[in-house]
């Protein structure tokens, strides 16, 4: 099913451990007991015994409705797939130190890898408006540094005291 989420947890008779630490359906710790006794406890409540942390000592098993759990898990995965592409924004100043520039580009790259569009803005304060060409150079450098991940959706343009552009991921 989903990547990184194990939906097939050992449950009921599939649990091979002789003893398990049991957590009830409300999340309350019951304690360590033989697997048989824990299974009987789950059956009395009409629920399943699911091994949620097999690598612990003793393994942790939870009493829950496994069918309901699996349904909610697949529902959550479908919801995550539907999330819309967000527009992220990264602001630069005209006088930016190299390390700060690299950090911001790293964030832009992460946004693009996550499938988001990125609006890159160079802000001009006071007399910096005379150096609009330097702002354009910063934006072109960002384009060059992200060309493996992004394409330019809207080229650099001046708007008030800001110069901005929009990058979109190549795979979209």
Curated annotation (Swiss-Prot):
Gene Ontology molecular-function annotations: ribosome binding; translation initiation factor activity
Domain of life: Bacteria
Source organism per UniProt: Thermotoga maritima (strain ATCC 43589 / DSM 3109 / JCM 10099 / NBRC 100826 / MSB8)
Function: IF-3 binds to the 30S ribosomal subunit and shifts the equilibrium between 70S ribosomes and their 50S and 30S subunits in favor of the free subunits, thus enhancing the availability of 30S subunits on which protein synthesis initiation begins.
Compartments, record wording: Cytoplasm
InterPro entries: T_IF-3_C_sf, T_IF-3_N_sf, Translation_initiation_fac3_CS, Translation_initiation_fac_3, Translation_initiation_fac_3_C, Translation_initiation_fac_3_N
PANTHER family, sorted: TRANSLATION INITIATION FACTOR IF-3, TRANSLATION INITIATION FACTOR IF-3, MITOCHONDRIAL
Principal location: cytoplasm
SUBUNIT field: Monomer.
Keywords: Cytoplasm, Initiation factor, Protein biosynthesis
Family: Belongs to the IF-3 family.
GO cellular component term, pick one: cytosol
Protein name from the UniProt record: Translation initiation factor IF-3
Disulfide-linked positions: none
Gene Ontology biological process: ribosome disassembly
